[in-house]
Amino acid sequence: MPSHANRSSGNSQMRWWVLALAAIAVSSSYYNDDVIGPIADLLHRQRGFSQSQLGMLNGVISIPNVALALINGLLIDRYGPARIAFWSAAIGVLGAALTAIGSPYELMVAGRFIFGISEGAIFIALLAGLAQWFSRSGIALAAAVYLSLARVGSYAVDTSTAWAHPLYQRGWQPPLWFGTGIALAGLVAASIFYWLDRHHRPELQSKAGEPAQRLDWAHLLKFDLSYWYILGLHVLYAAVFFPFRTTYAIEYFQHAKGLTLQQAGVANSWVFFAAIFATPIFGLLADRFGHRALMLTFGTLLLPLTFVVLGLTSLSLWVSTVMMGISFSLVPAVIWPATTLIVAPRRLGTALGLITLIQALGMAGSNLAAGRLADTAGAGSSNPAGYDVMLWFFFLLSLTALSSAVLLWRRETGPDGHGLEEVSAKALATEHA
């Protein structure tokens, strides 16, 4: 008995180290996910890339997610989340290296595609791995911290134009090789994560007679209406936020707002920096006061307002940055826990897989469409007005996201709600549909 108690105490302390390793690994993935944005102008000037080519470099990483969304759960169940995280990190290093070699253009696209295989798997694998280390009462806090620390990677790559300025002075390639080094650090963290998981992970207490859930194609689309509303919000919000912020924002700030590369990178980074600290706070507020659907509606409303401020006013860039920062902190903090309240536990894997699949398609399509629109309008440093059509595209897309949030709010305040508007204790007691 004492030895068992000591082992439990040791595992309780070790799980925080495991969380730190997972955060390092996923942060390296987030860093390389966004690595094209800061060098977009350099790729324009030094290699003559078009807006469509830049859009492809970011859009292509979403393509593997379509397939991985359907098989990730099966791979994790078959081989274990820690092993999948390790192999995903290794694939990510390969993709980052090919991207850094970067010539010809097709090799760079191939590198981004290979990195997309890693990016699509590692986030879910690490999160599933953490669920095996943390109890049911602790996984929510662990997931919030994990998500916040993951965004350190996004913040770091945006601010790299300032703290790694000498790299950017040397051209487009050194920042990509630096990103490869970051990916290698993530692989080291994933390796240690895998080793600790193999030798020290707490024993899982499975419920007798509870069969493993499989993807049921016959009932794939049989979800409650609230699920389809929140799926629409997942997809449309991501299709607006990530293409704009990771592909086009820095270049737009340079050409349309007159910022230097360093200033544009810092302005863009504050959205991710705020999310690092604010995401757990909004999650705690939702648990404390409820009104999750209302919070999602408010957070999504800030998205179209941001593009109105950018395109139709002369307000300081920091106004739109603060608005988008609040939105990006609030919506992810609430939408994932809200999804788990709407969907029955036995079907949660299928539900999240379907969300991930359609979300990947939406982000890839939005990236390519925005780039094509900007190219057609002749957007660039000599024609800042050419970016207006891209802003209108994102504005209209964000309005459709807002409509999904409003529909979800209306349903959840009626008799068919799932407890999203209630405080956590009541929500947990609500019957899953």
Roles of regions detected by a PLM:
Residues 4-12, 197-231, 423-432:
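Juxtamembrane intracellular "pre-TM" segments in multi-pass secondary transporters
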Residues 34, 62-70, 154-155, 272-280, ...:
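Residue-level signature of mid-helix packing/kink "hotspots" within the transmembrane helices
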Residues 36-37, 225-272, 276, 366-367:
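Extracytoplasmic gate region of multi-pass secondary transporters
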Residues 48, 80, 101-107, 135, ...:
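Helix-breaking motifs and short loop linkers at transmembrane-helix boundaries and internal kinks
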Residues 67-106:
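Conserved MFS/SLC helix-loop-helix module at the cytosolic interface between two early adjacent transmembrane helices
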Residues 111-150:
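Cytoplasmic helix-loop-helix junction between adjacent transmembrane helices
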Residues 145-198:
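Helix-loop-helix hairpin linking two adjacent transmembrane segments in secondary transporters
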Residues 292-338:
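C-terminal transmembrane helical hairpin of 12-TM major facilitator-type secondary transporters
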